[in-house]
Amino acid sequence: MDKDSQGLLDSSLMASGTASRSEDEESLAGQKRASSQALGTIPKRRSSSRFIKRKKFDDELVESSLAKSSTRAKGASGVEPGRCSGSEPSSSEKKKVSKAPSTPVPPSPAPAPGLTKRVKKSKQPLQVTKDLGRWKPADDLLLINAVLQTNDLTSVHLGVKFSCRFTLREVQERWYALLYDPVISKLACQAMRQLHPEAIAAIQSKALFSKAEEQLLSKVGSTSQPTLETFQDLLHRHPDAFYLARTAKALQAHWQLMKQYYLLEDQTVQPLPKGDQVLNFSDAEDLIDDSKLKDMRDEVLEHELMVADRRQKREIRQLEQELHKWQVLVDSITGMSSPDFDNQTLAVLRGRMVRYLMRSREITLGRATKDNQIDVDLSLEGPAWKISRKQGVIKLKNNGDFFIANEGRRPIYIDGRPVLCGSKWRLSNNSVVEIASLRFVFLINQDLIALIRAEAAKITPQ
């Protein structure tokens, strides 16, 4: 009985064990079947746990993020959430997968931040260096010296000769840039420091004269004949008033220029004559009232004026041709030739300040120095630093004709015609001789020249 009951118990336990095992197997098989049905749409692929950096595009379905999230979920729970969940992919993901190959979206051209910085940096030097091509370092130094001397940008624009022709506005803008723009000021200072000392000395010698300097120079009398020692003594007595690059020679040249334009203290400017007589064209232009001028045109009046102008020009031409004939008669009546000539003077070279007498058949013109003595020192007339030490020679031929030969570097103008170096030109009575802004009138002693021609005519037949 006991054995039978024990056998029945064992058989029931075995049956229940097999039944429970079969139920577990069926449940596991059902779970596998359900998971395989759920994962039927997602293809199985091999993936690595190593993360590879690569460029991502907008039209690409990024799967690395999914792999990252799945590996993180595996590490946390040990079960992959994508494979355990029986849910299908969402409709938005399906749309992304279906639309991605058909219409690829181009990558947005977003500029890198470094590129924009590079563009901004390259634009700045263009604005800074836009004027560096025209304004040379020598121009900047000239501008600074001139402003420090005069404190007036208008005077600087009128008096300083730059390498380019700048307008007053450009000069003002450059001065303000040198003062207030740190970049331009730094670049200009660096360029000026690189100038050669000789170039700096030449630029400093061109500095404008201040009002204090001209006031001291105007005290030197116009009737006196100051030498270089006079101006050197003036420099020693007033070192603070004069610019540091001033020399006695520069002071003498500027004093002669002031004397020529009647700017000295003991010189008086001639007043305008009373009445309708006017000295020059500029004074006549000042007297004209512009408000009374009208722009009304009259064709009949213009025709009459044109005919009258043509008639007057013809009369002027005739008078010019007869001028030398009438000049002899006028001189003999008025006696104008007596104060200029004597029995030994062949001709006179008359300027504004000095009168040079020609008493030999050949005289030399130029600028006198200690080592070079010449007959006619043109520095007595005015500024002569542009005149050569031996500028020219005036000769009297046997036939009574005067000729001038140019031996200097600069041309000599005779009645407006240039006579270059190595050339010569015939001088007639009342010829205007211009040498480096100095003008002279050449007057011939007609009586003495007539005697010379008569003697030459007597000698030639023999």
UniProtKB/Swiss-Prot annotation:
<dbReference type="GO" id="GO:0002151">
    <property type="term" value="F:G-quadruplex RNA binding"/>
</dbReference>
<dbReference type="GO" id="GO:0044545">
    <property type="term" value="C:NSL complex"/>
</dbReference>
<keyword id="KW-0156">Chromatin regulator</keyword>
<feature type="coiled-coil region">
    <location>
        <begin position="301"/>
        <end position="335"/>
    </location>
</feature>
<dbReference type="GO" id="GO:0045893">
    <property type="term" value="P:positive regulation of DNA-templated transcription"/>
</dbReference>
<dbReference type="GO" id="GO:0034046">
    <property type="term" value="F:poly(G) binding"/>
</dbReference>
<keyword id="KW-0175">Coiled coil</keyword>
<feature type="modified residue" description="Phosphoserine">
    <location>
        <position position="102"/>
    </location>
</feature>
<keyword id="KW-0158">Chromosome</keyword>
<dbReference type="GO" id="GO:0005730">
    <property type="term" value="C:nucleolus"/>
</dbReference>
<keyword id="KW-0805">Transcription regulation</keyword>
<dbReference type="GO" id="GO:0060382">
    <property type="term" value="P:regulation of DNA strand elongation"/>
</dbReference>
<dbReference type="GO" id="GO:0051726">
    <property type="term" value="P:regulation of cell cycle"/>
</dbReference>
<keyword id="KW-0804">Transcription</keyword>
<dbReference type="GO" id="GO:1904751">
    <property type="term" value="P:positive regulation of protein localization to nucleolus"/>
</dbReference>
<dbReference type="GO" id="GO:0006275">
    <property type="term" value="P:regulation of DNA replication"/>
</dbReference>
<keyword id="KW-0227">DNA damage</keyword>
<dbReference type="GO" id="GO:0008266">
    <property type="term" value="F:poly(U) RNA binding"/>
</dbReference>
<comment type="function">
    <text>Modulates the transcription repressor activity of DAXX by recruiting it to the nucleolus. As part of the NSL complex, may be involved in acetylation of nucleosomal histone H4 on several lysine residues. Putative regulatory component of the chromatin remodeling INO80 complex which is involved in transcriptional regulation, DNA replication and probably DNA repair. May also be an inhibitor of TERT telomerase activity. Binds to G-quadruplex structures in mRNA. Binds to RNA homomer poly(G) and poly(U).</text>
</comment>
<keyword id="KW-0995">Kinetochore</keyword>
<comment type="subunit">
    <text>(Microbial infection) Interacts with Herpes simplex virus ICP22.</text>
</comment>
<dbReference type="GO" id="GO:0005737">
    <property type="term" value="C:cytoplasm"/>
</dbReference>
<feature type="modified residue" description="N6-acetyllysine">
    <location>
        <position position="123"/>
    </location>
</feature>
<dbReference type="GO" id="GO:0045995">
    <property type="term" value="P:regulation of embryonic development"/>
</dbReference>
<feature type="short sequence motif" description="UBR5-degron">
    <location>
        <begin position="389"/>
        <end position="396"/>
    </location>
</feature>
<dbReference type="GO" id="GO:0005654">
    <property type="term" value="C:nucleoplasm"/>
</dbReference>
<feature type="modified residue" description="Phosphoserine">
    <location>
        <position position="282"/>
    </location>
</feature>
<feature type="modified residue" description="Phosphoserine">
    <location>
        <position position="108"/>
    </location>
</feature>
<dbReference type="GO" id="GO:0043204">
    <property type="term" value="C:perikaryon"/>
</dbReference>
<dbReference type="GO" id="GO:0045944">
    <property type="term" value="P:positive regulation of transcription by RNA polymerase II"/>
</dbReference>
<dbReference type="InterPro" id="IPR037912">
    <property type="entry name" value="MCRS1"/>
</dbReference>
<dbReference type="GO" id="GO:0030425">
    <property type="term" value="C:dendrite"/>
</dbReference>
<dbReference type="InterPro" id="IPR025999">
    <property type="entry name" value="MCRS_N"/>
</dbReference>
<comment type="subunit">
    <text>Component of the chromatin remodeling INO80 complex; specifically part of a complex module associated with the N-terminus of INO80. Component of some MLL1/MLL complex, at least composed of the core components KMT2A/MLL1, ASH2L, HCFC1, WDR5 and RBBP5, as well as the facultative components BACC1, CHD8, E2F6, HSP70, INO80C, KANSL1, LAS1L, MAX, MCRS1, MGA, KAT8/MOF, PELP1, PHF20, PRP31, RING2, RUVB1/TIP49A, RUVB2/TIP49B, SENP3, TAF1, TAF4, TAF6, TAF7, TAF9 and TEX10. Component of the NSL complex at least composed of MOF/KAT8, KANSL1, KANSL2, KANSL3, MCRS1, PHF20, OGT1/OGT, WDR5 and HCFC1.</text>
</comment>
<keyword id="KW-0963">Cytoplasm</keyword>
<feature type="domain" description="FHA">
    <location>
        <begin position="363"/>
        <end position="419"/>
    </location>
</feature>
<dbReference type="GO" id="GO:0006281">
    <property type="term" value="P:DNA repair"/>
</dbReference>
<dbReference type="GO" id="GO:0005634">
    <property type="term" value="C:nucleus"/>
</dbReference>
<dbReference type="GO" id="GO:0006310">
    <property type="term" value="P:DNA recombination"/>
</dbReference>
<keyword id="KW-0233">DNA recombination</keyword>
<dbReference type="InterPro" id="IPR000253">
    <property type="entry name" value="FHA_dom"/>
</dbReference>
<dbReference type="GO" id="GO:0016604">
    <property type="term" value="C:nuclear body"/>
</dbReference>
